[in-house]
Amino acid sequence: MLEKKGVSPIGKHLDRIRTKTLEQALSKHPNIQGVKEAGGSPAKIAKIIERCGDDFFVWSGNDDEAVTAMALGAKGLISVLSNVRPKKALAMLRACQKNDFRTAGRLQRELIPLIGALFCEVNPIPVKAALDLLGFDVGTPRLPLCPMEPEHLARLRAALRSCLG
């Protein structure tokens, strides 16, 4: 019945917080230190940093935008990739912290196929599959989620091989 009205009965939902709300209320709250921004807009990250100041931390929530976000002033990344390739993800972030965006960009470009594979289905399905392929017994996704589609699993396997380390 809900589907007929255009509402998904099962899923993850995000509340978008307006930049003005962050600036005027949340960034000044003593118990709020920052925000994870995963809206897919580098312009929004820049606007939050500009309006809320350097004392209010912004973390990228998108692995494929980490370098761009950090070049704009984000403090780091809340990452899916780091669960699967922690050394490479850390090397990319450390390069950003050193303002070595040439190296950071190269590392991110190398990781793009894996990042794409990690997001080809709803999280956490691909990361659980990747960890399983790496030999970690993390179990299968809980219902209503299901195991990864075979063609996506093949893509993930190839992407993992392409960026060893």
Language-model features: locations:
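Glycine/proline-rich, positively charged
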Residues: M1-F57
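Short, well-ordered helical secondary-structure segments
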Residues: K4, P9, L22, W59, ...
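Alpha-helix initiation/capping motif
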Residues: R18-T19, N62, R85
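Catalytic cores of alpha/beta
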Residues: T21, I48, D64-L72
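Short, conserved beta-strand edge motifs with alternating hydrophobic and charged residues
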Residues: K36-E37, V58-G61, I78-V80
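Active-site glycine- and acidic-residue-rich loops that bind
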Residues: G39-G40, W59, I115-L118
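Helix N-cap/beta->alpha junction signal
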Residues: S41, N62-D63, E149
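Structured C-terminal cap/extension of enzyme domains
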Residues: V67-G165
